[in-house]
Every structure is written in C-alpha cells, then in structure tokens.
C-alpha cells in the first residue's frame, strides 16, 4: 500500500538524493480472491514492480490480518528499523481503515518514536485524518498511478480513482490549481 499512500512523498525524497528503504510487513495472502500460496508470490512480484523506481522492498512476510501488538512482531519491526537506520519513517495513521495498517502504526511508534521522527500518511479518503502539512506530488502523479497499476491482482483502477479524488481534495484544501495533487 506504499504506492497508494506514500509514493509521491517518497519519490520526492528519492529525487532529492535521499536513500530510500521500503519495508512491507504483511504477505498479501488475504488481499484478493485467490487464497493460495501463489497469491503471496503474485503480491510480492507486484510490490517489487510497483516500487522499482524507489527501492527494492524488504519483506517481513507476516500473514495478512495477523500483524499485532505482540513481542515477536515488535522485535521484527524494531530490528528492521535499526538495520536501515532511517532519518525519518513514513507509516500509516493509527486511524487507518485496515487493521494491519493500524497495528503497524502502533508497532513503529513504539519501536522508533524515541529515535527517529515518524510521519503518518493520509488515510483512505482522508477519514479520521487531519494533515499537519501538505506535499505537492503533482509532478509524481503519473509515477504513482503507474506504480498502483502494477498490482493487477487487486483491481488497481479502483485505487487510482480513490487516490486521484483524495489527492485532488487535499490539493484543493491548499488552494492549489485544478489538476494538482
């Protein structure tokens, strides 16, 4: 879901010369109608292709729907954060619609908030989220769209429609011209 929620900002950071690491916590095993092991492989390939211009993702392979506030997951998250030693972390909001996103937000906050600044991305359709700042990603619109469309197993067009609406709305809040994201 990096492509939907964070791709624009991460692209900006990459273009200014920052080293970018992307970590995907869950395996995607329940994110589609195919519930076989092949779905995990498909989702991994889609993530690699979607993030190709940003970084090679690190996969933690925790089962979809099982990410939670437990000692093992805390350890895995903390180890991976310290392995890449980030200057900032971008993660999901604690108010996100998805239980794995909420769990990841909590785990990251507990693992890293005393060591590195954490930025929380917008929620799907902005529900229960009030931005503290806005980032113009208009120049990265096509890259974000292309990255989302790499996820063929998830009917990606619906997410493109949602991101266009959400990002247009946030741009309008800043009085940006029509066609801004």
How would you label these PLM feature ranges?
Residues 12, 34, 56, 68-181:
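Metal-dependent de-N-acetylase/amidase catalytic core
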Residues 1-84, 110-114, 146:
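Active-site rim/loop-helix segments in enzyme catalytic domains that contact anionic ligands
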């Amino acid at each position: 879901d990096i492509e939907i929620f964070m791709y624009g900002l991460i692209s900006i950071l990459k273009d200014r010369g920052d080293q970018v690491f992307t970590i995907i916590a869950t395996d995607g095993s329940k994110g589609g109608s195919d519930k076989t092991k092949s779905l995990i492989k498909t989702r991994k390939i889609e993530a690699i292709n979607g993030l190709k211009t940003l970084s090679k993702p690190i996969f933690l392979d925790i089962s979809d729907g099982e990410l939670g506030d437990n000692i093992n997951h805390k350890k895995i998250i903390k180890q991976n954060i310290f392995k890449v030693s980030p200057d900032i972390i971008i993660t999901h909001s604690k108010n996100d619609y998805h239980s794995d996103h909420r769990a990841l937000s909590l785990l990251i906050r507990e693992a890293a908030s005393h060591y590195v600044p954490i930025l929380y991305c917008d929620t799907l359709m902005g529900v229960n989220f009030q931005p503290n700042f806005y980032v113009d990603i208009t120049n990265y619109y096509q890259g974000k769209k292309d990255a989302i469309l790499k996820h063929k197993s998830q009917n990606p067009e619906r997410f493109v429609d949602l991101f266009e609406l959400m990002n247009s709305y946030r741009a309008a809040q800043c009085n940006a011209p029509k066609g801004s994201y």
